């Protein structure tokens, strides 16, 4: 008895006094559960019913205090009483002192264990816990509560040995249950430690572990195994997670493997998951790899032939980019050739970039050459030849042309030609006027002849009035104009100039008679002068 050995020694006290105290307290002590009123320990048919009633009964606090005080006084006599005596006194003392040998009696009676253990607890409550009701202690010592406590404590020990690398919802639920059990047990543990309750009732009240209890104790282990399987199925196979991001369900970290081998990150051990910026779930190049090595490792990777560090498109050198703001690329997303192929597969026609054409306006019209094609140019010359001569500086300017005219006018043949041309013009005017006056002169002569008294002559004159008059007048006028016309025809180049200048073009004014006398050269100069005038006037 651990509780009895811990109590102080009462051997110096008179045994008679102790016996008297026990006899007085026999009436106040409660009747032990599952026993008859006559003190016999044989159970009757109503043993189970009485045990339930005793369990439900709530003892008074004054009885608890009285029993506790008298139990200390009677503790010394418990060891001196022989357990094998057959007298009636010994039987009554054994009935009164059930607290001393409850372990020997309860081993044969499993139905009495709960009540006796509860009485032991209530009888051994110290004076410091008088306000605590005994009902709580009886519930605490119930075998069902003790079994649950053992299950939770064993589960707590198992969960402590279990690794916390991959906790799951199942583990968290079990841990929460263990924590609550620990809190409730810790709240009541001071009552057990501070009290003088013997440990043997606890062991006696708890039955030996059976197969069912072992299965219940081992049930947290089975739950942890299931949680381990769940955590293994959800955790990635690689030892690190890029930026702490978890891939979407169903994708996992085998994204680059399921891409049909198009392109993967060249970093050794990287499966293409995550991104350097944290904005994407995967990457395909070193620029977005969160596990990107330093420059020396990249250079070593470049020496390896199986490492992809540039665009994998056939015929692509890595130059250019789809966006246009970059000069190179290393992946299919920026390859312009792959982009064109993708658009071709979709059936989208891309228009090639065209160079900007200049806007049609005044500047272009100013740059266009003028249309200087002239009709009626001298023989052997064309508009292209005139333009070439003008660009080469062979065509004289207007001032040069004026000087040339003055120089030609000072010479004698030019002056005589001008005078003859003037006289010719005057003679032509006189010929026209004389031809108009001829009919009037003929009429006057006819009138004069009619007044003559010779009648035979008049009919002859009337018969041919116009013939004799027209005959002498026409040859007279022809004779007067013949010398000038012959002189003009005999002049060198005059006839050719007349043939060419007889039908001038409509938009150009007629040539002056002075310009017509210079021959082919004068005609060329005249045409050049006219072109310059047209350019100045804007024709």
Curated annotation (Swiss-Prot):
- The residues listed in the UniProt record as binding Zn(2+) 1, with positions renumbered to this chain, are 265, 270, 283, 289
Name the gene: ztf-11
Provide the family line.
Belongs to the MYT1 family.
Gene Ontology biological process: negative regulation of transcription by RNA polymerase II; nematode larval development; neuron development; neuron fate determination; neuron fate specification; positive regulation of neuron differentiation; positive regulation of transdifferentiation
Protein name, as recorded: Zinc finger protein ztf-11
Q: Which UniProt keywords apply?
A: Metal-binding, Neurogenesis, Nucleus, Repeat, Repressor, Transcription, Transcription regulation, Zinc, Zinc-finger
Query: Where does this protein have compositionally biased stretches of type Polar residues?
Result: 97-117
Q: Which SUPFAM superfamilies match?
A: CCHHC domain (SSF103637)
Q: What is its main location?
A: nucleus
Which residues of this UniProt protein bind Zn(2+) 2?
A: 311, 316, 329, 335
**Which residue intervals are annotated with compositional bias (Low complexity) in the record?**
40-49, 181-198, 205-215
Question: Localized where?
Answer: Nucleus
Organism from which the protein derives: Caenorhabditis elegans
Q: Which GO terms describe its cellular component?
A: nucleus
Task: Quote the biased-composition stretches of kind Basic and acidic residues, using this chain's numbering.
Answer: 60-69
How does it associate, per the subunit comment? Interacts with MuvB corepressor complex components lin-9, lin-52 and rba-1; the interaction is required to suppress the activation of non-neuronal genes in neurons. Interacts with sin-3; the interaction is weak.
Q: Where are the zinc fingers (CCHHC-type)?
A: 256-299, 302-345
User: Which InterPro entries does its entry note?
Assistant: Znf_C2H2C (IPR002515), Znf_C2H2C_sf (IPR036060)
The segments labelled Disordered in the record are: 24-117, 181-218, 453-485
Protein purpose:
Transcriptional repressor which promotes neuronal differentiation during embryonic and postembryonic neurogenesis. Together with components of the MuvB corepressor complex, negatively regulates the expression of non-neuronal genes during neurogenesis. Required for the generation of postembryonic neurons from epidermal cells.
Q: Name one GO molecular function term.
A: zinc ion binding
What does gene deletion cause?
Knockout in the rectal epithelial Y cell results in impaired formation of the PDA motor neuron. Knockout in Pn lineages (the precursor cells of the ventral epidermis of newly hatched animals) results in the defective formation of ventral cord motor neurons.
